Each structure stands twice: as structure tokens, then as C-alpha cells.
Amino acid sequence: MLKLNWGPIKSLNPTFPEIQSAVRDSDKQRFALKPRDPANDASSDPADWLIRANQGHSIKVDSEALLRPIAITTPQAAEEAGADDANGEGGGEGEKVKPVPVPVPVPVPETVVHGTYFAFWPSIVASGGLKRMGRNHVHCSTGLPGDDESVVSGMRKDAELLVYVDVERSIREAGMKWWVSENGVVLTEGVDEGGEEGLVPARFFREVVGRRKDVGVLWRDGEWVADLPEGLKVVVPVGKGGRGGRGRGGRRGGGRGGRGGMEV
């Protein structure tokens, strides 16, 4: 339930239309409003509405209930499967099955990319892949912010390294589960592997490339190609914290297994 008298919100004294506007106009579409009763979607009473984050949760959530699964399928097959579930097909003869809304699976996106930073690359290599850290999921996007108008979230615009992931291979070989949030962010809980929890293993990295031309390709087809260039300026981005490296503005290369900051 959306409660305008909840402590952190009450002090701001917002109106329901202001909250609707904030949710609707958010450039990253981080939140979603849902009517408690779908038949009452025109209500102006906040008590008739639910609000939630589309992704970025640090508390445990039910991915299957909130997110659309990614499956190795075709767009047509995915839509047909969703239609069958929604129509309650599958019951016995004469048996009426109450339709239950089921998230329609989506085919594997052509591009799934995670954005990170020079400061975090050594620790990614050392741990054997991308980690979800304190979140429930590793976040990816289906394109680069600014290059694709459909990409509204999933990666910071100042990301320095692009980690392209072979999602289909990760599903086939590791049974990894992938999801799409309401605002188009691609999410995965990863797998437990090599003593690490919630990992997207580096063997599923299709390519890791710097956004700067002088960085080049670091990883390809699950294999190391090169380290970060020596003397590269490494800056921990604002709001990302982490220890390691040489602090803000330090210089170093990115040798394999080196000590770095936390991955995001």
C-alpha cells in the first residue's frame, strides 16, 4: 500500500499526483505503480495503489513473481506460451481453470552488457566474474545509454568498461536464470561457483572492451586477451565506494588477479 504518512515520505508532504508524476517521468523508470485492484486503476486514493522498485533491491524478492524470465525461445513461441497460460489452458475436459497472470518469457536479447570501471576490473578477474555484491541481482542493459533510446537503465553513463555476456551459453551450460524488469533492465542472480556466490562466471564473457580506444579488448570468448594498460588513470566513481587500487586519481595497470575495489 502506498502510504503518504510513512516517515521518510511524510516529511516531504507530497501529493499523490506528484508521486504519479515522479514515477512516470523518471528517466531511469526505477519505480512502478500498480492498482491493488486492476478494475480500480482510475482511483486517486493512494490507499488503492502499490509502489515498488523495478530493480536494485537489496532485500529478498521473488524474481519469478515480479520479473519476466528470459528463455531460449523465439518471440512467437514466447507470446503463444504466455497466451496459453493466461487463458488457463491445460485443465481437464470440462474443468474450468481460473486465469492466472503469468509473466510472459522473453527471448534472449541480442545484446546483454554490464558496465563497470577500471578500478573494479582487477577484483572482477580475481573473483572469476561479476558478483551481485549486496544486491539481489547483477544488472545489465540491452544496449549503451545514449546510443539506444530504448535503454533507460541498467548501466551508468560514465561506465569505463563494457562486459558483454553470452546469456544463451550461460543458460545452456550453467542453468543460469535471467530476467527482465519492467523498465527493461536485464537481471540475474548468477550462480554459486568456485567458492563465490551470485557470480556471472568470466567464461561467459563474450567480450570485455574499454570505451576508450586506448584500452581495447581485455577479454573475448571467455578467455583473457590483455590487461589494462600500464599508467592508466584509475578513479573510483562517486557513489560506488570500495577499497583497493591506489585511491582516487591513482595510476596503475590492471594485471590479472590484482587487488581492486568492489565490483558494481
Question: What are the language-model segments listed below?
Answer:
Residues 2-138, 142-264:
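Conserved NAD+-utilizing ADP-ribose enzyme module
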